Curated annotation (Swiss-Prot):
It comes from Trichodesmium erythraeum (strain IMS101). Its cofactor is Mg(2+); Mn(2+); thiamine diphosphate. Catalyzes the thiamine diphosphate-dependent decarboxylation of 2-oxoglutarate and the subsequent addition of the resulting succinic semialdehyde-thiamine pyrophosphate anion to isochorismate to yield 2-succinyl-5-enolpyruvyl-6-hydroxy-3-cyclohexene-1-carboxylate (SEPHCHC). This is 2-succinyl-5-enolpyruvyl-6-hydroxy-3-cyclohexene-1-carboxylate synthase. Belongs to the TPP enzyme family. MenD subfamily. It is an enzyme of class 2 (transferase).
Length: 582
């Protein structure tokens, strides 16, 4: 038990931290500041919690987000009062929308120093609007036993709300009066002799429980799956147990004889041996309108969020098939506003129901074969064309690295073009690669810091990013000496925002280049020298493959591929519609 009895603030903060330790907290990220001194002392001196200081609050919050993604447990972030807390906001929004548990602790001035220009003071109560799962301002520190019990139970509730019913951020605003440094106060010192050793005795990590399906749910499923042609759409997913997740979807697919349209940002493509009905080229298949019309299903089983593909979404909207959306969270995953039913169960539960209730698989095998034959043809066309490309071309990067990275590598895929090329070209494999991403709100904020959080205490991690996403978060490089593990950054340097070249605005020059593509003209070799990082410029595909397998075990390095965003965009426009030529 690590309770500091020197002052009101040290007692209060150390009880808060000790409570979190008993609940399972392993890591706290702290940005420097004086108002948060009691919290900093409590975390930094706790022997069982890894506490990492990070200068920039925005970077700190995204680093914590990355660790939480990887560990599937809440991570604490701490900052001082004022605009420091505002810099947490982008990561809190992403945590909410991507359902990642974060516990946000913002130190604050006491009530008498607010709204009077006391300095470094803003209104921090409900600072993050509706984005936290729950938020509270704690009372001022006290050593009264009832107040300490209130603190303990409030922290327990806040921790639980980071995970249930849907993971997300929780905000504690914590006011402190002076003295902030651990200066002795008699009333705090006196507490030590009468403080109960059993104060934390009942605390245990909170266990997730599965809902028990009822007869109404089983009847609904039986009615939906009566001899209908159907598909499974497996969208964006960062499951805690990816192999179990993939096995469950494979069981559903083979029980119903439904093909599985698997997003590139799903682990399914990296466990392809589990699923003989895996469809990775759905976006390209659906570009053939005649075939797309034949492939319209009666029923769609949507697992979690929809894939990124606009082609798929447009086809689904026009088809207006009934969709069953499978996800335990309370989020609405129907941006198409179609005929949908949300079932708040896990995919593992659904697989168990289908198997134990003896659902038949007498669905249209010809429909299934049509999908599988199209997949085989398009995959062959992609592989043939890519194998002949010798120059550095952006779309080939995703195709190549999916066949090159070592087994069990974690990869963080940045937003904009990388996520789309992964969806188009990531080859199904058996490498058990786990993709990570920030697709809650699809921004480029915190790209590097999130990837570093995923890499922390893990040796094999890769980030695929464009130049603008990396430049937007270069403060993340300040973490280089805090990282325990390795991150290889595959940098696609196309001198600007390549995704805008795919949009109609690209035809309007000016102002397209200056205000949309926004080339930054940065020498990344010089940038790496500033931070003491390894940098290599890639000139051939063979060189890239050799540098990606095996991966180093420590440090950060950048492998830079210089591409032409206009030529890459033209290649996509010329080729994406042709792979389905039958």
């Amino acid at each position: 038990m690590s309770i500091d009895f020197r002052s009101l603030n040290t007692v209060w903060s150390s009880i808060l931290v000790e409570t979190l330790h008993h609940l399972g907290l392993t890591t706290a990220i702290i940005s420097p500041g004086y108002r948060s001194t009691p919290l900093t002392f409590a975390f930094a001196t706790h022997p069982k919690i890894e506490t990492i200081p990070i200068l920039d609050e925005r970077s700190a919050a995204f680093f914590a987000l990355g660790i939480a993604k990887k560990n599937y447990q809440p991570i604490v972030i701490v900052c001082t009062s004022g605009t420091a807390a505002a810099n947490f906001y982008p990561a809190i929004i992403e945590a909410k929308e991507s359902r990642i548990p974060l516990l946000v602790l913002t130190a604050d001035r006491p009530p008498e120093l607010r709204n009077c220009h006391a300095g470094q003071t803003i209104d921090q109560v409900k600072l993050y609007g509706n984005y936290p799962n729950w938020q509270i301002e704690l009372t001022l520190p006290s050593v009264e036993l009832k107040r300490l019990e209130y603190l303990r139970q409030t922290v327990i509730h806040g921790w639980e709300k980071t995970m249930f019913p849907t993971p997300g951020p929780v905000h504690f605003n914590i006011p402190f009066r002076d003295p902030l440094a651990p200066i002795n106060q008699p009333e705090a010192i006196a507490l030590e002799s009468k403080f109960s050793q059993n104060f934390f005795a009942s605390l245990r990590p909170i266990i997730r429980t599965e809902l028990i399906p009822n007869s109404d749910l089983i009847e609904l499923l039986k009615n939906q799956f009566k001899s209908h042609s159907g598909i499974i759409i497996a969208g964006l997913a960062q499951p805690e147990k990816p192999e179990v997740y993939c096995q469950a979807i494979a069981k559903i697919s083979q029980t119903l004889n439904f093909p599985v349209l698997a997003e590139g940002l799903s682990p399914l493509r990296n466990y392809s041996q589990l699923n003989p009905y895996l469809i990775s080229t759905y976006d390209l298949i659906l570009r053939n309108q005649k075939l797309a019309n034949k492939l319209i299903p009666k029923i769609v089983l949507q697992i979690g969020e929809l894939p990124t593909s606009k082609q798929l979404r447009t086809w689904l909207e026009a088809a207006n098939s009934h969709r069953l959306i499978i996800d335990q969270s309370d989020h609405n995953f129907d941006p198409l506003h179609g005929k949908t039913t949300h079932l708040r169960i896990s995919v593992e539960q659904l697989a168990k129901i289908l198997i134990t209730q003896y659902f038949n698989n007498n669905h249209d095998i010809n429909y299934l074969n049509l999908w599988c034959q199209a997949e085989e043809k398009v995959r062959e066309n992609i592989d043939t064309k890519m194998a002949k490309i010798n120059h550095i071309l952006e779309p080939k990067i995703s195709w190549l690295i999916s066949q090159t990275l070592p087994k069990n590598t974690s990869i963080f895929v940045a937003n904009s073009m990388p996520v789309r090329d992964v969806e188009f070209f990531w080859v199904p494999n058996n490498s058990q690669i786990q993709p990570f991403f920030n697709r809650g709100v699809n921004g480029i904020d915190g790209t590097l810091s999130t990837a570093l959080g995923i890499a922390h205490r893990y040796q094999k991690t890769v980030m695929l990013t464009g130049d603008l996403a990396l430049l937007h978060d270069t403060n993340g490089f300040l973490l280089r000496n805090k990282l325990v593990g390795h991150l290889t950054i595959i940098l696609i340097n196309n001198q600007g925002g390549g995704i805008f070249e795919m949009l109609p605005i690209a035809n309007f020059e000016p102002p397209f280049t200056e205000f949309f593509a926004t080339p930054q003209e940065i020498d990344f070799a010089d940038l790496c020298k500033t931070y003491g990082l390894e940098h290599q410029k890639i000139s051939s595909w063979n060189q890239l493959q050799q540098l990606l397998n095996p991966l180093p075990s420590s440090g950060i390095r950048i492998l830079e591929l210089q591409t032409d965003r206009q030529l890459d965009a033209r290649w996509r426009l010329d080729n994406l519609d042709t792979f389905i030529d039958l």
